[in-house]
Amino acid sequence: MSWQAYVDDHLMCEIEGHHLTSAAIIGHDGTVWAQSAAFPAFKPEEMANIMKDFDEPGFLAPTGLFLGPTKYMVIQGEPGAVIRGKKGSGGVTVKKTGQALVIGIYDEPMTPGQCNMVIEKLGDYLIEQGM
Protein backbone atom coordinates (compact mmCIF):
# COMPACT_ATOMS: atom_id res chain seq x y z
CA MET A 1 0.00 0.00 0.00
CA SER A 2 1.35 3.45 -0.87
CA TRP A 3 1.80 6.11 1.79
CA GLN A 4 -0.81 8.21 0.00
CA ALA A 5 -3.31 5.36 0.37
CA TYR A 6 -2.69 5.33 4.13
CA VAL A 7 -3.56 9.05 4.23
CA ASP A 8 -6.55 8.78 1.89
CA ASP A 9 -8.03 5.51 3.17
CA HIS A 10 -7.09 5.45 6.86
CA LEU A 11 -6.62 9.06 7.98
CA MET A 12 -9.15 10.93 5.83
CA CYS A 13 -11.81 8.24 6.28
CA GLU A 14 -15.28 9.00 7.64
CA ILE A 15 -15.73 8.65 11.41
CA GLU A 16 -19.32 8.87 12.62
CA GLY A 17 -20.10 11.12 9.64
CA HIS A 18 -17.07 13.39 10.11
CA HIS A 19 -13.59 13.71 8.57
CA LEU A 20 -10.27 15.20 9.61
CA THR A 21 -9.65 18.61 8.05
CA SER A 22 -6.25 17.39 6.81
CA ALA A 23 -3.62 14.76 7.54
CA ALA A 24 -0.07 13.77 6.64
CA ILE A 25 2.66 11.21 7.20
CA ILE A 26 6.02 12.94 7.48
CA GLY A 27 9.47 11.45 8.02
CA HIS A 28 11.45 12.37 11.13
CA ASP A 29 13.64 14.52 8.84
CA GLY A 30 10.62 16.60 7.75
CA THR A 31 10.20 14.93 4.34
CA VAL A 32 6.54 14.56 3.36
CA TRP A 33 5.74 10.92 2.62
CA ALA A 34 2.07 11.64 1.87
CA GLN A 35 -0.49 14.32 2.69
CA SER A 36 -4.07 15.31 2.08
CA ALA A 37 -4.76 18.20 -0.30
CA ALA A 38 -5.53 20.68 2.49
CA PHE A 39 -2.52 19.91 4.71
CA PRO A 40 -0.79 23.23 5.46
CA ALA A 41 2.61 24.13 4.06
CA PHE A 42 5.02 24.07 6.98
CA LYS A 43 8.55 25.26 7.70
CA PRO A 44 11.37 22.74 8.32
CA GLU A 45 11.94 24.21 11.79
CA GLU A 46 8.32 23.43 12.73
CA MET A 47 8.97 19.70 12.21
CA ALA A 48 12.34 20.02 13.97
CA ASN A 49 10.57 21.59 16.98
CA ILE A 50 7.98 18.79 17.04
CA MET A 51 10.79 16.20 16.99
CA LYS A 52 12.57 18.10 19.78
CA ASP A 53 9.39 17.96 21.91
CA PHE A 54 9.35 14.17 21.54
CA ASP A 55 12.97 14.09 22.77
CA GLU A 56 12.40 16.77 25.44
CA PRO A 57 8.72 16.59 26.50
CA GLY A 58 7.42 20.05 27.33
CA PHE A 59 9.72 21.86 24.87
CA LEU A 60 6.74 23.23 22.88
CA ALA A 61 4.60 24.14 25.89
CA PRO A 62 5.89 27.73 26.33
CA THR A 63 5.78 28.67 22.62
CA GLY A 64 3.02 26.47 21.22
CA LEU A 65 3.06 24.06 18.31
CA PHE A 66 3.24 25.81 14.94
CA LEU A 67 2.07 24.04 11.80
CA GLY A 68 2.04 26.37 8.83
CA PRO A 69 0.19 29.57 9.70
CA THR A 70 -1.53 28.08 12.76
CA LYS A 71 -0.34 28.11 16.37
CA TYR A 72 -1.77 25.40 18.63
CA MET A 73 -1.68 25.44 22.41
CA VAL A 74 0.00 22.19 23.50
CA ILE A 75 -2.28 20.15 25.76
CA GLN A 76 -1.94 16.80 27.50
CA GLY A 77 -0.31 14.12 25.39
CA GLU A 78 1.90 11.11 25.95
CA PRO A 79 5.56 12.13 26.49
CA GLY A 80 7.74 10.79 23.70
CA ALA A 81 4.77 9.29 21.81
CA VAL A 82 1.90 11.75 21.19
CA ILE A 83 1.62 15.54 21.09
CA ARG A 84 -1.82 17.14 21.12
CA GLY A 85 -2.61 20.76 20.36
CA LYS A 86 -5.75 22.87 20.55
CA LYS A 87 -6.89 26.04 18.79
CA GLY A 88 -10.46 27.19 19.21
CA SER A 89 -12.88 24.42 18.27
CA GLY A 90 -10.18 22.42 16.49
CA GLY A 91 -6.77 20.99 17.06
CA VAL A 92 -3.99 18.65 16.02
CA THR A 93 -2.70 15.22 17.05
CA VAL A 94 0.86 14.09 16.24
CA LYS A 95 1.85 10.44 16.78
CA LYS A 96 5.52 9.47 16.54
CA THR A 97 6.45 6.10 15.04
CA GLY A 98 9.91 4.65 14.55
CA GLN A 99 10.44 6.53 11.27
CA ALA A 100 7.55 8.95 10.82
CA LEU A 101 5.12 11.44 12.30
CA VAL A 102 1.42 10.78 11.69
CA ILE A 103 -0.40 14.11 11.88
CA GLY A 104 -4.11 14.88 11.87
CA ILE A 105 -5.81 18.28 11.99
CA TYR A 106 -9.48 18.54 12.91
CA ASP A 107 -12.23 21.07 13.47
CA GLU A 108 -15.78 20.80 14.76
CA PRO A 109 -17.93 18.76 14.45
CA MET A 110 -15.11 16.19 14.74
CA THR A 111 -14.02 15.77 18.35
CA PRO A 112 -10.48 15.60 19.76
CA GLY A 113 -11.13 11.99 20.78
CA GLN A 114 -12.10 11.00 17.24
CA CYS A 115 -8.94 12.61 15.84
CA ASN A 116 -6.78 10.92 18.49
CA MET A 117 -8.35 7.54 17.71
CA VAL A 118 -7.68 7.77 13.95
CA ILE A 119 -4.12 9.10 14.22
CA GLU A 120 -3.00 6.84 17.07
CA LYS A 121 -4.54 3.72 15.51
CA LEU A 122 -2.54 4.16 12.30
CA GLY A 123 0.56 5.19 14.27
CA ASP A 124 0.35 2.06 16.42
CA TYR A 125 -0.10 -0.09 13.30
CA LEU A 126 2.99 1.45 11.68
CA ILE A 127 4.99 0.85 14.87
CA GLU A 128 3.90 -2.82 14.83
CA GLN A 129 5.12 -3.01 11.20
CA GLY A 130 8.53 -1.64 12.18
CA MET A 131 7.90 1.74 10.63
UniProtKB/Swiss-Prot annotation:
Location in the cell: Cytoplasm, Cytoskeleton
Any single biological process term in GO: regulation of actin cytoskeleton organization
Entry keywords, A to Z: Actin-binding, Allergen, Cytoplasm, Cytoskeleton
Alphabetized CDD domains for the sequence: PROF
Disulfide bridge map: none
Gene Ontology molecular function, alphabetical: actin monomer binding; proline-rich region binding
GO cellular component, one term: cytoskeleton
Transmembrane feature ranges: none
Function: Binds to actin and affects the structure of the cytoskeleton. At high concentrations, profilin prevents the polymerization of actin, whereas it enhances it at low concentrations. By binding to PIP2, it inhibits the formation of IP3 and DG.
Family: Belongs to the profilin family.
Name this polypeptide is given: Profilin
Species classification: Eukaryota, Viridiplantae, Streptophyta, Embryophyta, Tracheophyta
